[in-house]
Swiss-Prot record:
Superkingdom assignment: Eukaryota
Name of the protein in question: Probable endo-xylogalacturonan hydrolase A
Entry's localization field: Secreted
Any one annotated GO CC term: extracellular region
PbH1 repeat start and end residues: 177-207, 208-229, 231-251, 260-283, 293-314
Main location (coarse class): secreted
Length: 399
């Protein structure tokens, strides 16, 4: 009897002390940085303090109708698995002396699980680039920063806010970044002076894998999306680009061997751009390297007043005399321009596209379902491109 009681008591104590897993999820920590309320007060330290408190899986909120003045680089170090909820205005200082030579305005380095978004769509990040446009017009050596500079890390989501007046490239992704998604963004650069907002690429996608851009509009004065060396598995869908240099590979091969591969663009509207889609590679010789472009497709592209619908430049950055001696050796494999329609500008009328493959390279390029018109003529035939020595082998003409 004594043994039985002891056993029962032991079991009862064990049962009383054991607790099952909790069904209650812990709430994310939420921080709202205190804004200084004046452009003379740098709000970056307050934001960094909030990241320190809430950056590990929490949320940092910039409320609607609030203004934060960022007079120095905002480094998001420590923001792991966290969210920046931008409903108000983040405005960078226009001090060109401070920004000269600095790479990033918002620095995202080796961060995993970062989300930057606006729930309301009212959020704005203002690069305040007018002074940079004016200074660069006077001094082309002026070294301008990029508002959102991402190197390394992964599982990054950026969505549903406006990024305006970047001094330089709007968004840069490189350094082995993987799984980055940009959606429902609005990027625009406008100068109030005669000095254009030069080099304001919308997105520069360099060394990275599995980057997606969708539902986005870009109005700028350079590439809408540039596929830079090391770009691999990039998808761009439902994008509208105005005033740009196109959805472009390159430039590649300036001083090293460069590769871009596995890119798909589908569903783009290109308005008043120098070209809608294209490739830019340096020729052979000198310090130039080998350019390799593999498995890149542009599909269902609508042209509105673009100078060229499609363009391949295999003698980029050098003059014709140089390229006669050093014809292009770029390797193009599995390149497809599919389903292009619309009307070009009158700049090259009746020519609507210019495809130039170098003699010493490979030119596996196809153009199908091409119905782009020049202002003076009808639709062009489908085209297939092969190599020819440093000449425009194949021009898409209205017929």
């Amino acid at each position: 009897m004594t043994f039985g009681k002891a056993a029962f008591l032991s079991f009862s104590l064990f049962g009383a002390s054991w607790a099952g897993p909790s069904r209650t999820l812990q709430a994310r920590a939420v921080c709202t940085p205190k804004a200084g309320g004046s452009s003379s007060i740098d709000d970056v330290p307050a934001i960094v303090k909030s990241i320190s408190a809430c950056g590990d899986g929490g949320t940092i909120v910039f409320p609607e109708d609030s203004t934060y003045y960022l007079n120095s680089v905002l480094d998001l170090a420590g923001c792991s698995g966290c969210e920046l909820q931008v409903e108000g205005l983040l405005k960078f200082a226009s001090d060109t002396d401070y920004w000269n030579g600095r790479t990033a305005m918002i620095n995202v380095k080796n961060i995993d699980g970062l989300t930057i978004r606006s729930l309301t769509g009212s959020g704005v990040i203002d690069g305040n680039g007018q002074n940079a446009y004016d200074r660069f017009a006077e001094d082309s050596s002026y070294d301008r920063p990029t508002p959102l500079y991402i190197t390394g890390g992964g599982d990054i989501k950026v969505s549903n806010f406006r990024l305006k007046n970047a001094p330089n490239v709007f968004v840069s992704v490189k350094g082995g970044t993987t799984n980055a998604v940009f959606s429902d963004m609005r990027l625009d650069a406008t100068s109030k002076s005669e000095n254009l907002p030069k080099n304001t690429d919308g997105f520069d996608i360099g060394e990275s894998t599995y980057v997606t851009i969708s539902g986005t509009t870009v109005s700028n004065n350079d590439d809408c999306v540039a596929f830079k060396p090391g770009c691999n598995y990039l998808t761009v869908t439902d994008i509208t680009c105005t005033g740009s240099h196109g959805l472009s590979v390159g430039s590649l091969g300036k001083s090293s061997d460069d590769i871009v591969q596995n890119v798909r663009v589908e569903g783009a509207t290109m308005i008043s751009s120098t070209k809608a889609a294209g490739i830019k590679t340096y020729p052979s010789g000198g310090d130039h390297g080998l350019s390799t472009v593999t498995n890149v497709t542009w599909k269902d592209i609508t042209i509105q007043n673009c100078d060229y619908a499609i363009q391949i430049q295999s003698c980029y950055g050098e003059d014709e005399e140089y390229c006669e001696t050093n014809p292009g050796d770029a390797v193009f494999s599995g390149i497809a321009f599919e389903g292009f329609s619309g009307t070009t500008s009158s700049k090259y009328d009746p020519v609507t596209g210019n495809l130039n493959c170098g003699e010493d390279g490979k030119c596996d390029v196809s153009v199908v379902d091409y119905s782009v018109k020049a202002p003076s003529g009808g639709a062009a035939e489908n085209l297939t491109v092969t190599t020819y020595k440093n000449r425009c082998l194949c021009q898409a003409r209205s017929v």
